[in-house]
């Protein structure tokens, strides 16, 4: 069937990704940065579309996605702005893809309209916020000032985001995987909330033992006319 064929393609993609990532070694863990761990978790979670716009200290997540996603035939687009990237997320999510973006405080603020539209349309999406100091332009030092903004949703209307706050590089990976699970279970935006220190911190990461198969048909997704 087409579903099983798509599943086989995904498994080959993930196998190739892990072959590249492990540098042809059989080790089960490596020393990696938190930002890299996010992408590892996303790949295992079946993320097949990453749309984003670079901003310090989240830019490394885009760098890693731009490096690994094309290697295994997944979609990466550097948008022209934060507003464009969150609207690409909206479009990808509406067709059932596992979508993700990453940004920091000023960029997250620009995405708020997209957040509320995702919630209103009941679409799953994962947004990673690597927080930096504010208010305004602020600086690139680490801070936890985006907490109220992302927990309360940020955009207009009565809705909430699901928010996961990792405490280690391992949790940067594990909670990114969990974010995709929750986003698709509840059809709601999920934010992985960390700061610049955690994004730059390097710790041993144990790779996930199982991967998520993203080829399960979502009955609510827009598939186009046939």
Question: PLM features: residue spans?
Answer:
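Single conserved hydrophobic/aromatic residue that forms the stacking wall/gate
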Residues: 1-13
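Thiamine diphosphate
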Residues: 21-153, 160, 177
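Structural beta-strand/beta-sheet cores of well-ordered domains, especially the beta-sheet scaffolds
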Residues: 51, 123, 162, 188-190, ...
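Conserved thiamine diphosphate
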Residues: 142-195
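Conformationally flexible catalytic loops at phosphate/diphosphate-handling active centers
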Residues: 187-226
